[in-house]
Amino acid sequence: MSIILANYNEEKYIAEAIESVINQTYTNWELIIIDDASTDRSQDIINSYKDSRIKTRFCKKNNHVAYASNLGIDMAIGEYIAKIDSDDVWEAEKLEKQVLFMEEHTEYGVCFSKVNIIDEDSKEANTKFSDIFELFDNVKNRSQEEWIKYFLKNGNCLCNASAVIRKAALECVGGHYNLAFVGAEDYELWMRLIIKFPIYIMDERLVRYRWEEAAGKISGFSLGKIYATFNLQTMVKSKMFDYMSDERSEERRVGKECRSRWS
């Protein structure tokens, strides 16, 4: 299991994220931390961990979390890939439960879980941020065809920090995040994967996903960010048709029907 943690200036939270990996009941992992040229104390905090399973790379120039994540993927040697953001927290049994599922169900390309929302003080905030909580909590298992239709109509509802990806499946769809879709790179990757592989949603909240109101934070809303995300998701939807192979004619038909509604 290779775990990718991309960080930029998260000195307040990164230790909590790292500790949640170290405390996993599943122990056969490597944690690859890519620091994207942080200017706070992040690098000192990262270097304070002496666990031999932790690998680090410190970038000299800030790029983007997607670029940093791709660097981590290139370093990964595990059969599975998981990604944790530097401000999120995993429950102790997350990896054990998901790896067991993936071992027993080899047809699936990705296993996700549901999440609890936490605030800046690491307190549960499912009610406070009910919209984002319900987005992730109401997700249910679907066929590949149903997922494609859902993604095209509704956008992303899957939490990146909850995913365990089979590395062979990731390599089958290009192996990396697409840097042409920075800001919606998770959504675009899920699109590519779902066309090729079924995915599974575990009905347990195995992640504490941090949501902040502060301006400029990754998880915060702003009008400009809403517009940018909408435009990016529209681009991803359009690109999806290029990914569909000729043998998936039914998915093309469903996709065209959906595109006619949002184009």
Regions found by a protein language model. Give the residues of each.
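Short, well-formed alpha-helical segments that are part of the catalytic scaffolds
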Residues: N9-N23
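Short loop->beta transition adjacent to catalytic acidic/histidine clusters or analogous donor-positioning motifs
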Residues: M1, I22-I33, R41, S52-K55
